[in-house]
Amino acid sequence: MHIETIGSGPDVVLLHGWAMHGGVFAPLVDELSGDFRLHLVDLPGHGHSVDAALPLAVAPVVEDLVERLPRALWLGWSLGGLFALQAALARTQSVRGVALVCSSPRFVRDAAGAGAWRYGMSPEIFEDFAAGLRDDWRGTLERFIALEAFGSDHAKEELRTLRDGLFARGEPAAGVLATGLRLLHDVDLRPALPAMPVPSLWLAGRRDRVVDPRAMREAAAMAPRARFEQVEHAGHAPFLTHAGIVADALRRFEASLSP
């Protein structure tokens, strides 16, 4: 796996979302690199890790990263949040705290009942994206990044940035795109949240149409030492359109953590 390290200060690991790469965090890097040492990861099959031998699977990726990186605050955006959460739950000694940006322990809505997850994405939408990958994966990515930008006060700017950055480090591996969708569909880390061993920050975009802020609020309520914050007027990628606000939230959170 490719890891790019930038800046100096306390260590922060940044994990990108589906179909993207570490370069997507550029506006946040500009805000934070003077205060933190940032470790930007390209997950297997993405960006400069397109030919990585490691599979895109939560446990193996986390194990590889904790062996290579110092103890740090881990930040995960969208899909990347599943890896950050797993690190916090399974490799506590390596994680000072975990920040989830527009991410959820469970991405898909569950049926009604005691374990219902009311605010997840419709399973039918996931199936539609999976079918689209088989028929027209480029068009499917275009639809997905449009959904990511939708709702933001700066939707056109956000869409342009996502579109320009999508293939900036080459095309993602087509098979890994399907694997990533399966992770988003299948993984459910909710049962582990009440025993979360490190502090957590759940940072939502109020107008996010991919991860409902209400799902993030509910997840934060399940975990001890958790805080929920919301970026007004932001969609699914608030670090693109409101990088200063996201950076300030991370600074406050990091300052509250034990060394």
What does each of the following model-derived ranges do?
Residues 134-187, 191-192:
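Conserved alpha/beta-hydrolase catalytic His-Asp/Glu region
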Residues 89, 94-135:
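Flexible "cap/lid" loop of the alpha/beta hydrolase fold
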Residues 2-54, 58:
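Conserved HGGG/HGGXW glycine-rich cap/lid loop of the alpha/beta-hydrolase fold
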Residues 209-215:
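Conserved alpha/beta-hydrolase "acid-adjacent" motif
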Residues 196, 202-204, 208:
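Short beta-strand/loop motif that positions the catalytic acidic residue
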Residues 231-247:
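Catalytic histidine-centered segment of alpha/beta-hydrolase-like enzymes
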Residues 76-80, 84:
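Gly/Ala-rich beta-loop-alpha elbow adjacent to hydrolase catalytic centers
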Residues 59-73:
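Conserved acidic catalytic loop of the alpha/beta-hydrolase fold
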